[in-house]
Amino acid sequence: MRHLDYTEQENWRQPDDTAYQSPIDIATQSVQPQETGKFAISFQDEVQYDDREIGEQFLVHGQLRLDDQIWELERFHFHDGAEHLVNGQRHDVETHFVFQHGDQTLVVASFGDVSANEKTGAVKNIYDNQVNAATLLRLLPDNHSYFHYVGSLTTPPLRHDIQWLVLTEPVAISAEDKAVLHDHYPDNYREIQEINERVITYYNDKN
């Protein structure tokens, strides 16, 4: 499968695309506090591989309970090099979990950084089809604090009105995990987009 060429991403935008694009650089000193927004995610064990032009996708059933609303998990995928920045800093990896609620889309973004102490990699297990719900939970931090904003998908079509939950704490990944992602689809991250006066909120899971 021929994947999107990220060296040509300046050609992805269409005239009618929203001005509120993703990803963005999140300046923590500018975020506003968010009082509610506690969530829980559950996964089922079976994962199906699906290679698409936008990159390799992993189809899996699961749910996100956000306050009193249920979102259904459609798929997840990886980015070799995080798409979102935090205070100008890029994490090693970003995982996107794509959820649906009717015609609405929400993406949970989870960062990963290589750790010398992490020897067995969840990412490699997923590509080796050695995966269950416990493996997928390793892609999420225990602390569910996050930044929230409204943006777009980061691959064409750049659909608008996407709810983004960008988790603040990275998970540890192995060097082998990072190498697997780089071998499959190197540097597949979109350039940072203008914030354009959007409001970014912060939910503290520890409160």
In which residue ranges do the predicted regions lie?
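Alpha-carbonic anhydrase
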Residues: M1-N207
